[in-house]
Amino acid sequence: MLFFRPSAHRAPQAKAFRFMSVCWLAASMLTLPLVGKAVAQEVNLYTVREPGLVKPLIVAFTAKTGIKVNTVFMNDGLAERVGAEGARSPADVMMTVDIAKLLEIVDKGLAQPVRSATLEAAVPAQLRDPDGRWFALSLRARLIYAAKDRVAAKPLTYEELADPQWKGRICIRSGQHPYNTALIAAYMAHHGEAATEVWMKGVKANLARKATGGDREVARDILGELCDIGLGNSYYVGLMRSGAGGPDQEKWGKAIRVVLPTFSNGGTHVNASGVALAKYAPNPAAAIQFMEFLVSDEGQRILAENNFEFPVKAGAPMHPLIAELGTLKPDSLPWAEIAKYRKAASLLVERIGFDQ
């Protein structure tokens, strides 16, 4: 009987072959997910903005880039939710309204810096964080609504609202509303707390009715001759005059003349909507691409068309109903400086009984 012993020199070859096969298989397994990610990019957006505004932006962005946007809509509590989710949060981009909300995101350490030549070229320096942790997208101005037939067509300042000539002629919503506490905080940043208290008491003395309702009700009461002037946001003018709120609101909007007031030592008070890149964004490159789209001409046009806000990008198209309001010259006071006075503004409203 013959016995065959395997050749000793073949064993190393077999081992080498098996080793190469395992390496090839491992490389293949690593490569497949990478290919999948390149083909199917996505962005996770958390926002408090209305679906009717956000969805056209998403459709246009996806059509342009092929990147899918998964959106979580919420009424409020964006910072609280992202903070609670921690490092496991799927959020890439956070979109919100009110500069105080953007600063809250930064203060809670929920955003990461973005360095983008596109964003920095489109958004003026005073409308973005110096470290790139948030960027404004659109602006709403705090305006004066005035009766066309009872108030002379001339420039006005916020300071003049305390002038006795307006006694019994001013309508305004609650002083505790964020629109007004932001304005009061800006006044404090310009003039100090003591001067602001004197001003607020003067405005209160000039009220035609209790500080209540909303900005559109200010226009309604001007039409009804309950008051002659009042404070309201710019986008409500477009909303009313467009007829989107119904025929009654269209009448209110067309009954007023709009004044772009300024501080005596500054510009028009504005607030903003804006975006930030989440600290633990799982898709940062695609997220930045989405943020850059939002400040492109197309993104700014969609924002303006659907929300009656002023674009942040110079020369970007705006809705005709907003363009006709005149040239906006935003106050240059840094928002971080204004934010320091938000609590003091609220306490002042309470202390003097402004809403009583």
Residue ranges: model-predicted function:
Residues 41-103:
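Early extracytoplasmic/lumenal segment of secretory-pathway proteins
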